[in-house]
Structures are given as C-alpha cells and as structure tokens.
C-alpha cells in the first residue's frame, strides 16, 4: 500500500512539473508564433469558404510576419475590426501606405492610403464589410497572416499572396483625373 502511494505521488509530481512547463510554452506559442482560426461568412469567397454557409475553413494564422508589419499586397490577414474591437475579421491586403486605390461600390472615389495604414477588402465584393466601408486600417490592428487552409482536408493548401486582377493599383495621381 505504501509503495502504491509513492508511485501515485511521483506520477502526480511529474505531471505537475510537465503541466507547469507545457502550459506557458503553449500559451506563448499561440500568442507569439501561430494559431488556428475558423473562418465564418462569405466575404472571402471563393478563396475561403467556397461552399458558403455549409462549411467553414480553418486557417493557420502566423503572428510572426505581422509582428514587424511585413505585409504585402495580396496577403490574407486577420485583424481587429475597426468598427467592433471585440471581433476579428479576415481580409486581403489590397494597398499599402502611399498607394492610391479606387474604392469599389457606389462611391467610386480615389483614396491615398495614409502612412501606417493598409487597405483591405474581402474577395467577395458584394458581401464584404471592408475598407470600402470603413476606410484605411491602421497597421496596429493587424493580428496575423493567414498562410494555409488546414481544414477541411480536401482543401488543405498554402494561401497565395495575389491581388485580384480587377484590383490593380492606380499608378499615379494623374491616373485619378
């Protein structure tokens, strides 16, 4: 009986040591390096959730790349919603600071993206709440860079950083006139 209590005590002690090492490492990894997220909604179709409401893609979000604001045109990023800080949204980077972009929708105007900001849009233009609605987004709202689709298994793939052909940038301010 005494032997069995000693074994239980050693096991419990080893478990506690492992737990108190593993939890901080896991939390740090998920906060600083990468995490996974489920994508909901139709705003990024056909790139994400091509099946509509029947399926939700799960993506790998890499925190490392956005840590130094290393974003490129075409990247799919996760960011804090400028209209609801409790919500994270996923959009494609269309323009960087200093770029001139033509807005989509009823306004059809030109906007020069200010310093420290980016222009983001959903791939499904008619169903996306994006920079066409709320304007340029501060780089400080960036959360992560979506790099891969992890689920469902048939959609496993690397997400490419490509600009949609209809969203080519305005080359100069003269092109706006």
Curated annotation (Swiss-Prot):
- Per the UniProt record, which residue ranges are transmembrane? 19-37
This protein's GO cellular component annotations are: mitochondrial inner membrane peptidase complex
Q: In what way does this protein cross or attach to the membrane?
A: Single-pass membrane protein
Note the NCBIfam families from the entry. sigpep_I_bact
Positions of disulphide bridges? none
| GO MF | endopeptidase activity; serine-type endopeptidase activity
Name the UniProt record assigns to this protein: Mitochondrial inner membrane protease subunit 2
Q: What subcellular compartments does it reside in?
A: Mitochondrion inner membrane
What organism is listed for this UniProt entry?
Answer: Bos taurus
Q: Gene behind this chain?
A: IMMP2L
- A Pfam family found in this protein is Peptidase_S26
Task: Provide a GO biological process annotation.
Answer: signal peptide processing
